[in-house]
Amino acid sequence: MPDVDPGFRRDYPVDNLQFPNSTSRFQKLRRTAMSQLLDRLNFALELASRAGQLILQHYRTDGLLVESKADQSPVTIADRDAELLIRQQLQQRFPADGVLGEEFPDTPSENGFRWIVDPIDGTKAFVHGVPLFGTLIGIEHHDRMVAGVCRFPAMDEVVYAADGHGCWWKIRDQAERRTHVPQTTDISHARLMFTEPTHWRSTGRFETIVSVMDQVRIARGWGDCYGHALVATGRAEIAIDPLMSPWDIAALIPILREAGGHCTDWKGHETIFGGDGVSVTPALKDQVIAILSKAPPLPGK
């Protein structure tokens, strides 16, 4: 693995956190727990930056070998090397934490913390030189997603969040800013993001996305994590995927939650195991879920 720079990092003032109406012992416990989380979030930001630098060494290069996995999804050396880098760094820094990733076997957790990693979400975009692919790192604590990082290496852009600390957005060398989902209340004014038609047809759900498209103002096929990041940063109201693995959605759940929105499965449940996913604003959630919940179920769900 090549040496890489530490990258962007945000340091939170954990010592100044206050928890009203709590005993001193409980405040200390909560402060300790929050410190553990924010240490991990800061490290996740570093890891996403390091992985992104590695990925860009392969981006838009001649002769990039693209293989097909068992499910026919593409994978490259950049996918594998980036996840391996993340796993190796995690083993050194947080050896008791578990890791669930797309490219390698699971590592069980010994302390309740688990990292859920997709080194390149949007490998097809990456392979074809489209900059909308991202590195996703989610942090789970006792089965709850508590922090997430979504970094777009080719655009030098990152969206991240941790429980109780808001959702933040940073582009290149600009100052980071806190971000929120749009306040749109009328679905006819909404902007919809969706993924490639192949998945909609293969799951028998093409008519479902058409039903949502008929309701909104604008529909664009900017899929994968980029579409969901658009919702978190106030540039879209709805992003829908008919197929999502745990590593596709894990980082997005806390990001959307802290941005004031929702990232759930099509039944409206906040879970990494639903098999599908939607990011949506609070005002439009019930309308969108009402449509999605009528879709044909995924096999085994």
Language-model features: locations:
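A cross-taxon signal for low-complexity, glycine/charged-rich
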Residues: M1, G7-R10
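N-terminal subdomain of lithium-sensitive/metallo-dependent phosphomonoesterases centered on the IMPase/IPPase/PAP
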Residues: R25-I120, A283, Q287, S293, ...
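DPxDG-like acidic metal-binding loop motif
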Residues: S109-W168
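Acidic active-site catalytic centers that drive phospho-/nucleotidyl reactions
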Residues: S73, D79, E83, E102, ...
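An extended, acidic
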Residues: H180-K301
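Residue-level signal for inorganic ion chemistry
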Residues: I55, D79, L90, T123, ...
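Short loop segments at secondary-structure junctions
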Residues: E140-R144, A154, D163-G166, R172-D173, ...
